[in-house]
Each structure stands twice: as C-alpha cells, then as structure tokens.
Amino acid sequence: MKDKNIILPVQPYLLLDAENYHEILTGRMGISNFYEFHVQDGVPGTFMAVPDGSTALVFGIGERDVKVFIGGTVLRLKEWKFEEGRYYFGVRFLPGKSILPDGLSIQDVVNTDLEIDRNEYGQHLTDSLAEAAGIRERAEILCHYLEGNRKSRIKDTLSKLEEYMRKRIYATSGSITIQMLSRETGYSECYIRRVFRQIHGISPKEFERFIRFQALLNRIGENAGKGGSQEAALSCGYYDQSHMMKDFRMFAGTTPEKYRKLISRKAEQINCDEREVDSYGIGEN
C-alpha cells in the first residue's frame, strides 16, 4: 500500500527536454517511477539533474549492445550526460529503497553515475529489456528481477530506524530537527546520523533540504499556470521566502516563478500519454 506521505522524486528537466519522454508513476516495491526517452544520433544527450535523494538504474539500449548505469542523488544542479544513438529505459527508486549490486555502497553512487556489468541484476535481463515491446513490458520484466533480489533482504534494526526517520522527515516536510529525532528514537544524534548516511549516502539535514525542494517541485507541477509558488513554499517546510529562493536557485538553477512558467508551457504541449499513473499494479502479485 502506498504511503500518502511519500514524495515521489521528480527530475523535471528530463520531462521538459528529453525526446519522446514517457513515464509511469508507481510508488510500489520501493520504486518511484519507470521512464523512457530517446537520444538520437548527432543530438547532444545532456540534461540537468536536480537533487532528489534517490537512486536511478538506467539501461541504454543501442543497436549493438546495452549499457547499464546506476547513479545516486546529485547534491546540487548538475549535468546528466547520455550517449547519443540510444533508447533509455530507467527506474527511479524511492529514497532508502535502492537495490545496489553486490560490492557497491550507496556512498559510491552519490553525485555520480557508474557503468556496471550488464549482468549485475541477473542473466539475460538486458537482452529481455532490449527485446521487450514497450515501457510497460520492460517495467514488468525489471520488477521480476528486482523482486528476487529484494526478497533476500531482511529488515534489521538499522533499516527500521532509518525507515522511522525517513517517514518523520516526510511527515514534517523536512522540518524535524536531528535533536527531535534523537529524542523520539532514544538514539544519540551521532548514531542516527551515521545510520542515515549508511543507507542514503547523505546526512539527514541534506535529505531534508532535498525533500523540501522536491515537495515544492511537486506543488508547482500540480498547479502549473496557477501561480502561488510562494504560498506553496511555506507549506513545504521553508522558513521564509529567502530560504526557499536560496535552495531553489542552487538545486534548480532558476527561480520558482521561471520554473513555473517552464512547466506551464510544457503542460500546454504535453501529450497525456507522456505521464501516467500505474493503475495496473506493476510488480504486484
């Protein structure tokens, strides 16, 4: 069952700039969304990535091979480069829910993208994805492989503590203090920082900043063309307008008002098939 407090991570510049972009929003199995787009030959495949606290697994399907990449959250606005002449299919995990290959820690992928062996997530996975008919079939195939990996994981004390902290951060729009989390859990501030960083690769304070920013992106996106970004910012955990503007410029590279106009123009052009909510239960038994 989907947690109503979960904020699905948004990468707006893919939606705005990528060719033939399509995504399926889900929130199931620790997955935020599946997405696809093309980078044609001779076309620069560079987009801007924003902080989202999540991890993305991307398959670049070419005529001769399939390349696999995994990347964690960026720490501020950063270029995200893709090889031209490939179709890309990706899955974005919810924060704290990423499934990493053996031998790779979350710290290894924060603020970077790593190319990994094509068989890291299972034999024949990339071949099956390359031969699939479309994004929904690819999502079903990938879920099958990921589910086998996830079932082997046991929820221990550390993951339960992290889950509690993450849910409290969501519920308070990123405004709960580390001191309050320490009092609520009974663990020291130093210990809960260490546990959180072990699972997310970033500190609770950084994660809270990203959650406030992502909540604001979602609010602006839901109200594209209607204004009210300042009011939305206050409801997303920011102390004041100055606080909001500083983070937004650092993370989005623009102002909330200019971003709202970009989203508004896209909303006027967007094909309803570009973005859909998973109503078919991808990955559910």
PLM features: what roles do these ranges have?
Residues 1-163, 169-171, 177-179, 185-189, ...:
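Alpha-helical bundle regulatory/interaction domains
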Residues 176, 193-198, 205-208:
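Long, low-complexity intrinsically disordered regions
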Residues 198-202, 247-259:
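A secondary-structure capping/hinge motif
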Residues 207-210, 242:
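Conserved structured core elements
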